[in-house]
């Protein structure tokens, strides 16, 4: 099939819950990609977590064969992309492999902040955009108002928007005709030499690493010797094919097509996403521009509740890493929690997804330490450090200055919830940069410290706006800040797993809250237990768990007072000895509850 004019490569852009995976299901159904009995909801969301949470995490691809009204048969390559801010990187990869996009907007809710970010990315990639207004069958649907909103915010023409209901299947044929007539075919191949973009890779236990590619020039066929231009690795192609969404093996992938190949590659880490794949014998001269590397911004420790599970955790993380190159980890040990791993994530949702996959797919019971971000430390001796583990923070006396990362956040919220959202941003040390109105929705741009966002910002934003606010952010700058290390001591012993780096203005409040929480969680012992929060050597908050007291006088019926005094003195001496040598066991449940994300 070398008719590039009959190929359409497109991605679907939409905010969470605006219906993109449902639309993808209807397109697959309409084009006969699966029989009716094989259809399930959200066909392209392959992970159970994706289906349950109703979100797309990994970008998926499918080739559809469509007989258009003009009598020609078209080959449509659909990339279903994630909508959540943590997975924006998956979106950028999908967009780079396509020429056009379907912008799906919920006609009952209008434009959301994350949609904006993805649309601007699509425009940067020179995409032709087809507007699709979904959920037309709902009583709250306001297509004309939403069209006006899109013209005001994004500035694209909405006169030929396609109105559909993906759930009931209304207007699906109109979407397919719009894809064929409005989206451009791939550019003509300028050379016969293979040049392909590595879009994604994942691990298959039978085939090894499966690589998703978009062929730009030339062709990719079985038994070909190929070279990865970033790593200079050479492999022999074993299988070539595409998804419909079932796996189909074919002989060759031509220019303009999206498909997969396998080549006995052992690790996903060997395949750099955005790399250029070329023929080993006749390599292309210039590599494709690729993507900017995806760096983790949120870090936390993962520890097994049972230390014998450590090897199992190590193997499980290695397997997850095979499918998720954006996830990083390294070994670390804690005096309170034993040996575990320090892990880096793209954001809090990414952290939750990894945690959930570890417990579900690998049956692991884990303790997660408080999330932290990367701080830049300037030492007095001129040395510069980057730290994401509070335990690694040097002595404050030796530090010249500390910088924390700030983000630029775009929040879109209905007018009636604006006050609550503004006060939340102010409480989180935010600085307002811009404030505008589009119809009855406010669009505010804030500069916020990432440290404040990783705790509970997203949950609180959703609750104070009854779920209507949408939030999108990107890293902005590092700025000097008055940061301190908040330590927690139990019976004068530092519990390193509970240490956090906080802004000085929030230290006392955070310390007091942690002490109160631990007081409720640690069971009473036979001695008083002091729980303290400290900054350096200064104690800023304290709670005391009162001792349990055994009634040593229960068997003394009357009799001499000196007998009672002797028993009480003996008890007192025993408690003194316990205070001196006794270790306070903090139960795992107390750790888990104390480290719950959320700053009460």
Curated annotation (Swiss-Prot):
One GO cellular component term, please give it.
plasma membrane
Q: Which GO terms describe its biological process?
A: positive regulation of translation
Specify whether Cell membrane is a keyword of the entry: yes
Claim: Hydrolase is one of the keywords in the record: yes
Which positions does UniProt annotate for GTP binding?
A: 17-22, 134-137
Give its E.C. classification number.
3.6.5.n1
Q: Name the Gene Ontology molecular function terms of this record.
A: GTP binding; GTPase activity; guanosine tetraphosphate binding; ribosome binding; translation elongation factor activity
The free-text function statement in the UniProt record for this protein reads: Required for accurate and efficient protein synthesis under certain stress conditions. May act as a fidelity factor of the translation reaction, by catalyzing a one-codon backward translocation of tRNAs on improperly translocated ribosomes. Back-translocation proceeds from a post-translocation (POST) complex to a pre-translocation (PRE) complex, thus giving elongation factor G a second chance to translocate the tRNAs correctly. Binds to ribosomes in a GTP-dependent manner.
**NCBIfam families per the UniProt record, alphabetical:** lepA (TIGR01393), small_GTP (TIGR00231)
Q: Mind telling me what this protein is named?
A: Elongation factor 4
Q: Taxonomic lineage per UniProt?
A: Bacteria, Pseudomonadati, Pseudomonadota, Alphaproteobacteria, Rickettsiales
């Amino acid at each position: 099939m070398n008719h590039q004019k009959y190929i359409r490569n497109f991605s679907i852009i939409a905010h969470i819950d605006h219906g993109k995976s449902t639309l993808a299901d209807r397109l697959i159904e309409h084009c006969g990609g699966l029989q009716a009995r094989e259809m399930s909801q959200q066909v392209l969301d392959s992970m159970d977590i994706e289906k349950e949470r109703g979100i797309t995490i990994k970008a998926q691809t499918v080739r559809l064969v469509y007989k258009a009204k003009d009598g020609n048969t078209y080959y449509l390559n659909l990339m279903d992309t994630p909508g959540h801010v943590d997975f924006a990187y998956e979106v950028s990869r999908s967009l780079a492999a396509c020429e056009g996009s379907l912008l799906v907007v919920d006609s009952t809710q209008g434009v959301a902040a994350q949609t904006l970010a993805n649309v601007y990315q699509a425009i940067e990639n020179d995409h032709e955009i087809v507007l699709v207004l979904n959920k037309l069958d709902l009583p709250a649907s306001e297509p004309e108002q939403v069209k006006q909103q899109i013209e005001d915010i994004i500035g694209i023409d909405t006169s030929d928007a396609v109105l559909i209901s993906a759930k009931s299947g209304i207007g699906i044929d109109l979407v397919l005709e719009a894809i064929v007539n409005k989206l451009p075919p791939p550019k003509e191949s300028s050379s016969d030499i293979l040049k392909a973009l590595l879009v994604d890779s994942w691990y298959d236990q039978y085939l090894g690493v499966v690589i998703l590619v978009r062929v730009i020039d030339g062709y990719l066929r079985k038994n070909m010797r190929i070279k990865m231009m970033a790593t200079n690795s050479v492999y022999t192609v074993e299988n070539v094919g595409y998804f419909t969404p079932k796996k189909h093996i074919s002989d060759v992938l031509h220019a303009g097509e999206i498909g997969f190949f396998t080549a006995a590659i052992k690790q996903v880490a060997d395949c750099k996403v955005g790399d250029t794949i070329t023929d080993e014998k006749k390599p292309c001269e210039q590599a494709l521009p690729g993507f900017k590397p995806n760096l983790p911004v949120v870090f936390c420790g993962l520890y097994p509740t049972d230390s014998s599970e450590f090897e199992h955790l190590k193997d499980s993380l290695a397997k997850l890493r095979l499918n998720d190159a954006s996830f990083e980890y390294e070994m670390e040990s804690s005096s309170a929690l034993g040996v575990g791993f320090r892990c880096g994530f793209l954001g809090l949702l990414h952290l939750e997804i990894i945690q959930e996959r570890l417990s579900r797919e690998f049956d692991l019971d884990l303790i997660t330490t408080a999330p932290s971000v990367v701080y830049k430390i300037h030492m007095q001796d001129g040395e510069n450090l980057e730290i994401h583990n509070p335990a690694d923070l040097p002595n404050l006396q030796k530090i010249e200055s500390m910088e924390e990362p700030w983000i630029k956040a775009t929040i879109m919220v209905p007018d009636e919830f604006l006050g609550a959202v503004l006060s939340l941003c102010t409480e989180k040390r935010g600085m307002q940069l811009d404030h505008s109105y589009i119809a009855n929705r406010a669009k505010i741009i804030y500069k916020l410290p990432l440290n404040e966002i990783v705790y509970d910002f997203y949950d609180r934003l959703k609750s104070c706006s009854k779920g209507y606010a949408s939030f999108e952010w990107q890293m902005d700058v590092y700025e000097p800040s008055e940061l301190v290390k908040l330590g927690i001591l139990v019976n004068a012993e530092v519990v390193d797993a509970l240490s956090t780096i906080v802004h000085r203005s929030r230290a006392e409040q955070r310390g007091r809250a942690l002490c109160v929480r631990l007081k409720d969680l640690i069971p009473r012992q036979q001695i008083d237990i002091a729980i303290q929060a400290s900054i350096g050597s200064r104690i800023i908050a304290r709670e005391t768990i009162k001792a349990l007291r055994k009634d040593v006088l229960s068997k003394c019926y009357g009799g001499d007072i000196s007998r009672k005094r002797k028993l009480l003195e003996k008890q007192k001496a025993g408690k003194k000895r316990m205070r001196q040598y006794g270790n306070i066991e903090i139960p795992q449940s107390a750790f888990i509850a104390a480290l719950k994300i959320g700053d009460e």
